[in-house]
Amino acid sequence: MNVGPRVLIVDDHPSFRASARVLLESEGFDVVGEAEDGASAIAEASRLQPEIVLLDVQLPDTDGFDVAAQITAATGHVPAVILVSSRDSSDFGPLVSRCGAMGFVPKAELSGERLQELLA
């Protein structure tokens, strides 16, 4: 049983959710749930109370920047939101910090070490 930080993975691509789960669990994180869109992300974050929300920037019903702000407002606690995208962080400029996210990681560079660096 994992005892690391509790993580909610939010992405509309099942293959990314599955690979992120395997990667994070192998590095000691406790993946407590998954969501495929903004509405379910907000509901799951409220229900599961994760310490970290790994949140895709592009979701089918909204964008990750809006979801990040809503999760903080809706859950009553402040999980560390880490945005991910297949695009480079330079595409998003100051939007990452404005939405309350702890940081950004390109999907190709996702690792437990990168998450720990952002959380430090």
Residue ranges and their predicted role:
Residues M1-R6, G112-A120:
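Non-catalytic signal-transmission and effector/linker regions of two-component phosphorelay proteins
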Residues D66, R87-V105, E109, E113, ...:
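Alpha4 helix (beta4-alpha4-beta5 surface) of REC/receiver domains from two-component response regulators
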Residues P14-G33:
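Two-component/phosphorelay signaling modules centered on CheY-like receiver
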Residues P60:
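The feature encodes the CheY-like receiver
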Residues F65-H77:
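Short amphipathic alpha-helix used as the core "switch/output" element in two-component signaling
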Residues V78-S90:
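A short, hydrophobic beta-strand element within the central beta-sheet of small alpha/beta folds
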Residues D37-S40, D63-D66:
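Acidic catalytic/metal-coordinating carboxylates
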Residues D11, D56, S85:
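Active-site residues of response regulator receiver
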